[in-house]
Amino acid sequence: MLEKFRLAKEAEVRELLRLRDAGHVHAPWDRPRPGFGAALTRSESSGIIAEYKRASPSKGDINLGVTPAEACTGYARAGACALSILTESRYFKGDLSFLTE
């Protein structure tokens, strides 16, 4: 299954790297991002990483009526110290715009 994902994303990753190397920087990479490791190692950290995805290859659609911002706000309120937000579109119905919400 992982090889299937890798092959599906290979061309997209090449294009993103080409754009980056040409100096084209787009959101969410145009500003500093919180440190994932720092969130996990803070003394008051719960150590919980919450994952947001709109679909999965094995389960299909997952709660499409909730926006990424709503879901992630709920995860943070419930104690998550870090978020994993899937942006892969073909298999997980994600989008890079999820990272700017």
Task: State where each predicted segment sits.
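Conserved N-terminal beta1-alpha1 strand-loop-helix module at the mouth
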Residues: 1-101
